[in-house]
From Swiss-Prot:
Annotated Polar residues bias: 402-422, 452-463
Membrane spanning stretches: 651-671
Positions bearing the site annotation: Involved in receptor recognition and/or post-binding events: 57, 63, 88, 95, 170
Alphabetical keyword list: Clathrin-mediated endocytosis of virus by host, Cleavage on pair of basic residues, Coiled coil, Disulfide bond, Fusion of virus membrane with host endosomal membrane, Fusion of virus membrane with host membrane, Glycoprotein, Host cell membrane, Host membrane, Host-virus interaction, Inhibition of host innate immune response by virus, Inhibition of host tetherin by virus, Lipoprotein, Membrane, Palmitate, Secreted, Signal, Transmembrane, Transmembrane helix, Viral attachment to host cell, Viral attachment to host entry receptor, Viral envelope protein, Viral immunoevasion, Viral penetration into host cytoplasm, Virion, Virus endocytosis by host, Virus entry into host cell
Coiled coil: 554-595, 615-634
Protein name: Envelope glycoprotein
Extracellular side: 33-650
Cystines in this chain: 53-609, 108-135, 121-147, 511-556, 601-608
Subunit structure: Homotrimer; each monomer consists of a GP1 and a GP2 subunit linked by disulfide bonds. The resulting peplomers (GP1,2) protrude from the virus surface as spikes. GP1 and GP2delta are part of GP1,2delta soluble complexes released by ectodomain shedding. GP1,2 interacts with host integrin ITGAV/alpha-V and CLEC10A. Also binds human CD209 and CLEC4M (collectively referred to as DC-SIGN(R)), as well as human FOLR1. Interacts with host entry receptor NPC1.
Topological domain spans for side Cytoplasmic: 672-676
Lipid-substituted positions (S-palmitoyl cysteine): 670, 672
Length: 676
């Protein structure tokens, strides 16, 4: 019995110790404490790149289509410049494709253009085509134009992105963003019972104050849309307008709207009042911030700083019919082709959304009800005469703006809107040159995309690019996906020459790294811990706080790589063209055959003086730049025998955790031994 009791004592202690060990294991499983936590400051783009390269496509469900906005490449987004990228063409059927996720857009557009006879220029959106769901600013343009016929395509071959549908044409009264469709291989998401249920689909306009974004609508009026006399006016109300220039940022227009309201600069009669901003006024306010950084404006505007300049009737004529343009038609009651089946009703999110901190307000319409406290100054007789002098109903009168007394600055009082308005600045895509105060701002003509009907859209785009047209200087320097490629080929086809070795480094930001995605599910579906297995079954239980940021960095890097590769290919194309011309001449053989007639140059004359320029240095510099940016950045060693997962550094927290568990077990054994 004694021996039996002695043998039973360790067995009882072992049972108690095992109980505590199983409690620890179950606690770890229930709460999914990760063995290693990768934070934002430790996970680099190279690490993510290595994970992506190690992942394999196991099923077609991992292939996701994502819409990438052109504005992420740094293209100009102001209305006068953006509309130059669109043009009408007849005989080309539209194409519609679906995609699963898209970027949050800073600038979206909504067009409602009519002909002079009142007929519509743009087709009605088919059933299933809805507004782009994530827009910081919606530029709503209404007015008239000749509309040469056909449909409105993108001259540079891009898509018009709607809600999970990308079309090659613009639909009337439907908000869209410019972009392209990319296909990404994403790892399978592990299904877990803690996963949040699907919520409502994303939308721009919402009455939910808990939404993580804020949309502002800016209204414009256009006259002679698509011609060489196109004139855009920023609409303050139905009688007050401001002559629009490419240098005006959305933030400037929002503050300009508040200033006009607070300083009583609106038309107080039945006629139209058109203002023109002094060309010396600095309008480059704001910065790339998107929704995650709700920063206040660093400056406010006053009437003295703006220096309003009157525009006489003879230099600006706005059609009276523009104020009565019918409102946009809903995108849910459409005739024609039905694209509803292309949008999945229960599509799963491609990328988990981050919980954007900060309080937001309801969407704002710039031309809506005034949101600032009116100026205490009454509209006196002088102000009334001053306003009547510029209303477009009478002839040009004396300019009283230079003699108007200065006013006390009236600051806007709507602090909520100023905190939620998102600063954005695009200095590389804005024109800063002064404009004449007496010449109305005009845009270039929308040239037709060509008369030959291509079989596919890329062919149509190439034919369009071959048409010589004036190009804005800022467009030439834009680091876009398609813009540099097409314009470079256009320069070759139109005979534009380039000085040898004149490639200069681009000091402007090549793309905006702050990219966020929207999916079929609302951001609320990702609140809390995101259960995301990281690229493979070996990393089960690992999660990261920096997934979104590093994936954004990857996309930005891919954009840079594509941009630099495109520039190198442009040089290759030109070098090939010149070498081909030179090889056709093949002077040595031809001179030998034509010696008795004086040689090639004697027969051909100046045409034989074609010397292929040496572009090797330029091409080599571009390739070296690509190697420096994307190859020399050493990645973790895949062949490390001790690292079959994510690198030995990732095992440091895991080792600490395992060591802690071992110490806890030893402590429990000691406690149990002394207790028993």
């Amino acid at each position: 019995m004694g021996a039996s009791g002695i043998l039973q004592l360790p067995r009882e202690r072992f049972r108690k110790t095992s109980f505590f060990v199983w409690v620890i294991i179950l606690f770890h499983k229930v709460f999914s404490i990760p063995l290693g936590v990768v934070h934002n400051n430790t996970l680099q783009v190279s690490d993510i790149d290595k994970f992506v390269c190690r992942d394999k496509l196991s099923s077609t469900s991992q292939l996701k289509s994502v819409g990438l906005n052109l504005e992420g490449n740094g293209v100009a987004t102001d209305v006068p410049t953006a509309t130059k990228r669109w043009g009408f063409r007849a005989g080309v059927p539209p194409k519609v494709v679906n995609y699963e996720a898209g970027e949050w857009a800073e600038n979206c557009y909504n067009l409602a253009i009519k002909k002079v006879d009142g007929s519509e220029c743009l087709p009605e959106a088919p059933e299933g085509v809805r507004d782009f769901p994530r827009c910081r600013y919606v530029h709503k343009v209404s007015g008239t134009g000749p509309c040469p016929g056909g449909l409105a395509f993108h001259k540079e071959g891009a898509f018009f992105l709607y809600d999970r549908l990308a079309s090659t044409i613009i639909y009337r009264g439907t908000t869209f963003a410019e972009g392209v469709i990319a296909f990404l291989i994403l790892p399978k998401a592990r299904k877990d019972f803690f996963q949040s249920p699907p919520l409502h689909e994303p939308a721009n306009m919402t009455t939910d104050p808990s939404s993580y974004y804020h949309t502002t609508t800016i209204n414009y009026v256009v006259d002679n849309f698509g011609t060489n006399t196109t004139e855009f006016l920023f609409q303050v109300d139905h009688l007050t307008y401001v002559q629009l220039e490419a240098r005006f940022t959305p933030q400037f227009l929002v503050l300009l709207n508040e200033t006009i309201y607070s300083d009583n600069r609106r038309s107080n009669t039945t006629g139209k009042l058109i203002w023109k901003i002094n060309p010396t006024v600095d309008t480059s306010m704001g910065e790339w911030a998107f929704w995650e950084n709700k920063k206040n404006f660093t400056k406010t505007l006053s009437s003295e700083e703006l220096s309003f300049v009157p525009v006489p009737e003879t230099q600006n004529q706005v059609l009276d019919t523009t104020a009565t343009v019918s409102p946009p038609i809903s995108a849910h009651n459409h005739a024609g082709e039905d694209h509803k089946e292309l949008v999945s009703e229960d599509s799963t999110p491609v990328v988990q959304m981050q919980n954007i901190k900060g309080k937001d307000t309801m969407p704002t319409t710039v031309t809506g009800v005034p949101t600032t406290t009116p100026s205490p100054f009454p509209i006196n007789a002088r102000n009334t005469d001053h306003t009547k002098s510029f209303i477009g109903l009478e002839g040009p009168q004396e300019d009283h703006s230079t003699t108007q007394p200065a006013k006390t600055t009236s600051q806007p009082t709507n602090s909520t809107e100023s905190t939620t308005l998102n600063p954005t600045s695009e200095p590389s895509s804005r024109g800063t040159g002064p404009s004449s105060p007496t010449v109305p701002n005009t845009t270039e003509s929308h040239a037709e995309l060509g008369k030959t009907t291509p079989t596919t859209l890329p062919e149509q785009h190439t034919a369009a690019s071959a048409i010589p047209r004036a190009v804005h200087p800022d467009e030439l320097s834009g680091p876009g996906f398609l813009t540099n490629t097409i314009r470079g080929v256009t320069n070759l086809l139109t005979g534009s020459r380039r000085k040898r070795r004149d490639v200069t480094p681009n000091t402007q930001p090549k793309c905006n790294p702050n990219l966020h995605y929207w999916t079929a599910l609302d951001e609320g579906a990702a609140i809390g811990l995101a259960w995301i297995p990281y690229f493979g079954p070996a990393a089960e239980g690992i999660y990261t706080e920096g997934i979104m940021e590093n994936q954004n960095g990857l996309i930005c890097g891919l954009r840079q790589l594509a941009n630099e590769t495109t520039q190198a290919l442009q040089l290759f194309l030109r070098a090939t063209t010149e070498l081909r011309t030179f090889s056709i001449l093949n002077r040595k053989a031809i001179d030998f055959l034509l010696q008795r007639w004086g040689g090639t140059c004697h027969i051909l004359g100046p045409d034989c003086c074609i010397e292929p320029q040496d572009w090797t240095k330029n091409i080599t510099d571009k390739i070296d730049q690509i190697i420096h940016d994307f190859v020399d950045n050493n990645l973790p060693n895949q062949n490390d025998g001790s690292n079959w997962w994510t690198g030995w550094k990732q095992w440091v927290p895991a080792g600490i955790g395992i060591t802690g568990v071992i110490i806890a077990i030893i402590a429990l054994l000691c406690i149990c031994k002394f207790m028993l």
